[in-house]
Design a protein with these regions (language model features):
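Flexible, solvent-exposed extracytoplasmic
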Residues: 18, 48-63, 67-216
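Extracytoplasmic
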Residues: 1-53, 112
Length: 216
C-alpha cells in the first residue's frame, strides 16, 4: 500500500543498490540486522526478523554471523583507508558465503560493496566429513567455503563414489529468481559438487537437474 511504501521510503543507499539488476546478491544493514525489517522491503536481506525461527539458521547467526557482524562494525569504525575497509570483508567468510555484496553502513550514503562475496553458487574441490551438526558449525571457524564443504556423516552416503575433480572451466550461475522458483545454469566437463548460498528447507521444495526430479 502507499502508506506502507511511505513507511519504508528508499534511502540513498537503497536507491544505489537498486541500480544493480543482478538477481543474485544480498544486503546487510549494519543497523541491528537481526531485528531490522526495512531492508527486506527493497532487497534480499541477510538480516530480518521473524518470531518463528529456523533453528539451524539461528545457530549460524549466533555462532558465525553475529560475531562477523560485530567485527565488521568495529573494524569499519577504525578503518582509515579503502584498503582497511576491504581487509574487513576478506575475513567475513560466513557473510561472504551468504553472498553479502552490499553493506548499508549509513543509509544517507552510498553502500559499501564487498568484493569478496562468493556469489549465489559455486563448485568446491574438497569434502570434509564430520561427526555431527555441532562439528559442522565448528568447522566453519577455519575452513575456506570456496574450496571445501563440510558434511555431517549422516549425509555421507549421498557422496559415495563422488571424487571432486578440479575443472577450471566449470561454472554455475543463477539465471532467474522468484520466492518459490530459483533456476541455475551450469557447465562442467566432469561431475561437480555445487554449493548453493541458500537456507536448506526440504518441505515443499523440489529439485530438478536437467529437468529430472532429483532427491534433495
Amino acid at each position: 500500500s502507499e502508506q506502507l511504501h511511505e513507511s519504508y521510503k528508499a534511502s540513498v543507499a537503497d536507491n544505489e543498490i537498486l541500480k544493480d539488476k543482478d538477481p543474485s546478491y544480498r544486503v546487510l544493514n549494519l543497523n541491528d540486522p537481526w531485528q531490522d525489517t526495512s531492508t527486506s522491503y527493497y532487497h534480499k536481506s541477510i538480516g530480518g526478523y521473524h518470531a518463528a525461527k529456523l533453528r539451524r539458521y539461528q545457530e549460524l547467526i549466533d555462532h558465525r554471523l553475529s560475531p562477523e557482524y560485530m567485527s565488521t562494525v568495529q573494524s569499519l569504525q577504525k578503518a582509515k583507508t579503502e584498503e582497511d575497509v576491504m581487509a574487513v570483508f576478506a575475513s567475513t567468510t560466513s557473510l561472504n558465503m551468504l553472498n553479502m555484496r552490499y553493506i548499508i553502513y549509513n543509509p544517507t550514503q552510498r553502500p559499501i560493496r564487498n568484493p569478496y562475496a562468493y556469489g549465489n553458487a559455486w563448485f568446491i574441490g574438497q569434502v570434509q566429513i564430520v561427526s555431527n551438526a555441532d562439528a559442522e558449525m565448528k568447522a566453519l571457524d577455519s575452513l575456506n567455503p570456496l574450496e571445501t564443504v563440510v558434511v555431517d556423516k549422516r549425509f555421507a552416503n549421498n557422496l559415495i563414489g563422488f571424487v571432486p575433480q578440479k575443472d577450471t572451466t566449470a561454472a554455475i550461475v543463477m539465471t532467474s529468481y522468484k520466492p518459490n522458483v530459483v533456476t541455475y545454469k551450469s557447465k562442467a566437463v566432469s561431475e561437480q559438487l555445487a554449493i548453493f548460498s541458500e537456507i536448506y528447507y526440504q518441505p515443499g521444495w523440489k529439485a530438478f537437474v536437467d529437468g529430472k526430479l532429483t532427491p534433495h
